[in-house]
Amino acid sequence: NSTVIQLKYMADLLQKKINIHGLWHAGSYDPADFLGRLIEDKRWTTNIERGMFFAYDYNYFATNFHIELFIKGLFGPPHDISYHREDVMKRIVRTGWPMEYLDETLEQYKRMPKKNIILFPHRMAPEKQPEIFRDLKDNMPQYEFIIAQERQLTKNEYHNLLGEAKLVFSANLQETLGISWYEGSLVDTIPMVPDRLSYSEMVL
């Protein structure tokens, strides 16, 4: 959000003490994210992301995995800026899971009768590996394999589908948080996720 930079400029020029808080979810520093995958010249994106980091007084990340990914992408080789690593670390806050409110939000979808549905709840992107999901479909005809984004679902329709499914599936190569497995577990749908990325902290 470019407003953050404008706010920081004005505060410093007016010598006003403010605190800016930023929540990080993804960026070009992650080579598996579509920003890291599709943007070829990352000199401008990584410099902007570093600038945003230092504009924030507090930078919030849900997992240690994301923190390590962020530091490696923006402050590791070839960026020779280890001289202010202490300043980097003091600006980082690991929050843990930030979405406890979902339990109450999804209350009405709990204890729904289960159908033989396995759900793919992610965006259709290479880093989400939907082809693995389709391969499983060919070998497990007793289940209905549904890719949520292939249907025009309202939020209520999606949550009903999540509540009816027996399993929510991920073979992701990119995940810094992972909301869909958590939503699934709240409505008694079993999460099937890999032991990597943020999943190793959040699920396993």
Question: How would you name each of these model-derived features?
Answer:
Residues 11-41:
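Active-site proximal beta-strand in glycosyltransferases
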Residues 38-59:
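Membrane-proximal helix-turn-helix segments that form the acceptor-binding/catalytic region
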Residues 54-107:
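Donor nucleotide-sugar binding/catalytic pocket of nucleotide-sugar-dependent glycosyltransferases
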Residues 99-128, 134-138, 145:
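Conserved donor-binding/catalytic core segment of Leloir-type glycosyltransferases
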Residues 159, 181-186, 197-201:
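Short alpha-helical segment that forms part of, or immediately flanks, the ligand-binding pocket
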Residues 159-165:
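Short alpha-helical donor nucleotide-sugar binding micro-motif in glycosyltransferases
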Residues 172-173:
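Aromatic "clamp/platform" in nucleotide-sugar-dependent glycosyltransferases that forms part
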Residues 190-193:
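Short hydrophobic beta-strand element within catalytic cores of glycosyltransferases
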